Amino acid sequence: MKFSIVISTYKRDDGKTPELLKRTLDSVFNQTYKDFKLFLIGDKYEDVNEIFEIISKYDSEKFYFENLSYAKERDRYKNSNKMALWSYGGVNAINYGIIKSINDGYNLICHLDHDDWWYPNHLEEIKKCIEETNASWVCTKSTYFSEYVFLPKKITNKEYENFLPESGGLIHSSVCMDFKKIPLLYRDVYDLTNTIGLPADADLWERTREYIQNNNLKSYFINKLTCRHDEEGYSRN
């Protein structure tokens, strides 16, 4: 079983990208399960030498990096629509990494924000869950804002199996999807409707839930804490 890990990154206005990205990458390469490839996509990262300096420290055979020549959402929204930027910034880069992963033969894809990180057992727990349940979509327990343990909405002991994603109900860095079985990408809802709807990840979970139900697929919540997202990395820049 092999995993693709997709990370999109950009040069933050607060200058914290190098330290946060290094923490994220360290967490990936410290995984106990090693059969993965990381696809890092620069969303028009302005100082590419800064990125090369960071990634030079990691195993190049497990690493793919590409810097896009344009940042579709940030170029469009940064000076005109901050809410659209926060909701949909990086969608094009994330989707680019997903499609690149699929074209390279990966179907189990994990999305990891460049300021989130995993505990060493994250991929191992997902692998075991998929082997035991044949789930097409899984997520793990996360922490969010000062060690707050984040559980999906309305979770009970009886809902671990066939747990369905929903908007606002999970941290997307805790999710792994089989994109061969669930061929859905992130969307810029504002670009489609000219209104601020659900953020890109929440929109994807709503569509994913419907797809899982309509196609009788299996989904699962892993009741183990393996993913971190907190205020240190939080930014709308």
What is the role of each PLM region?
Residues I51, Y58-S101:
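Active-site-proximal specificity loops/subdomain of glycosyltransferases
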Residues R23-D35:
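Short, acidic, metal-binding catalytic loop of nucleotide-sugar glycosyltransferases
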Residues F36-Y45, E66-Y70:
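Short beta-strand/loop segment that forms part of the nucleotide-sugar
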Residues T143-L151, Y220-N237:
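Active-site donor/metal-binding and catalytic loop motifs
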Residues Y106-D115:
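Short beta-strand-to-loop acidic/aromatic patch adjacent to the donor-nucleotide binding site
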Residues Y88, K158-C176:
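A recurrent flexible, glycine/aromatic-enriched loop bordering the glycosyltransferase active site
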Residues E124-P152:
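Conserved donor NDP-sugar-binding/catalytic core segment of glycosyltransferases
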Residues T195-L204:
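Acidic donor-binding loop at a coil-to-helix junction in glycosyltransferase catalytic cores
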